[in-house]
Amino acid sequence: MPAYNAAKTLEKTYADIPFDIVDEVILVDDASTDETLQVANGLKIGHIIKHDNNMGYGGNQKTCYTLALQLQADIVVMLHPDYQYNPKLISSMAGLIANDVYKVVIGSRILGKGAMGNGMPVYKYFFNRCLTLFQNILLRQKLSEYHTG
């Protein structure tokens, strides 16, 4: 979980992870200024890394993936601790990979309850939709969202 100032939503997200199929949880705190690290420690998350300096979303993801590779993970799920993605869907999504249906499965904040209903700011939603429309036209695809982070 790439975390930045996620203290308010981390516990709810973590509680809904399906631990019957999830072996390890990695949380990388990207120099949060709130209580994210304390909440993570209280939850006894297996692997917690703290960045001393904010590395940004990309840097945070790289740290998550590097540790997942070191742990020799079979399937890696990048779950954001802000609950814009429902952790209860991990079993279904990972099953598609484990059963060789797909090599990659990408979640969408746009489908279902909707991104703004899950806390996405209006300006981010607007630009996400514009970029997705442009990319769908350019690439002749029909994805609900290209920018899932």
What role is predicted for each listed range?
Residues 6-9, 32, 86:
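Donor nucleotide-sugar binding loop of glycosyltransferases
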Residues 21, 43-45:
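Short, structured coil segments at secondary-structure junctions
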Residues 31, 56, 84:
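A short, conserved beta-strand element in the Rossmann-like catalytic core
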Residues 73-84:
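Short beta-strand-to-loop acidic/aromatic patch adjacent to the donor-nucleotide binding site
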Residues 51-53, 57-70, 87-149:
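Acceptor/aglycone-binding surface of glycosyltransferases and processive sugar-polymer synthases
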Residues 29-37:
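A conserved acidic beta->alpha catalytic loop
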